[in-house]
Amino acid sequence: MKTKHLLQALALVALGQGAVHAAPLMLQDASITATYNGAADGMLGLDHDFAAGPGANTTKLDPTDTGVEFLTSDFLFGIDFSADGLLTVIANYAVAPGAYSMRFDLGGALPVTTFTLTGMEGLTGIPSLSIIDSHTIALDLSGVDWSEFSSLSARLETGPAVAVPEPGVPAILMGGLATLALVQNGRSGRKPRA
């Protein structure tokens, strides 16, 4: 088998399996509305300087990613969202188990398909994470015992339907080699042998 035929075959194989998926930043520029223990006035948002008032439970994602987006009105918890879908809840004090629940409506962000616990530091008990609908998530922190500045992290992800396929590096290289082989074959004026 000639080299150019081998290159053509390798290029076709590489193109057939070279796609990888890149997930877009799902919370970039998101406007998030939150409730704490079922009450809108239980959450204080960054856009309102964490002060109570109408609409204080809605805030945009912090573009500097330097602080939390929400504080609970009892100042027990700070809630931080990152643009790549990581949610972190931080206890500002030692917090005994009690009835603590939070809901977050992510507004126009991409639909959430998975919400998984990724880490816990300085707390005991298991929080309950749930997806209410494609844009709303809930945390039930009842039965969780928090030490001061303990935290939990959870990852929000979108499904494969929103992933953007991109060709992998090997596929691009093999595609270029295939193009060169085809051009070379066309210039020679000969018909390829099978």
For each predicted feature, which ranges?
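Generic structural signal for beta-strand residues in well-ordered domains
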Residues: 15, 163-165
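Gram-negative bacterial Sec-dependent N-terminal signal peptides
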Residues: 2-20
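N-terminal regions of proteins, emphasizing targeting and processing segments when present
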Residues: 17, 36, 173-176
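Hydrophobic alpha-helical membrane context
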Residues: 16-20, 178, 188
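Short alpha-helical segments used as structural interaction elements across diverse proteins
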Residues: 1-5, 184-188
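A short, hydrophobic C-terminal helix/tail in secreted or cell-surface proteins
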Residues: 165-185
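Mature extracellular "passenger" or substrate-interacting domains of secreted, surface-exposed proteins
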Residues: 23-163
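Short, charged juxtamembrane terminal tails flanking transmembrane helices
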Residues: 189-194
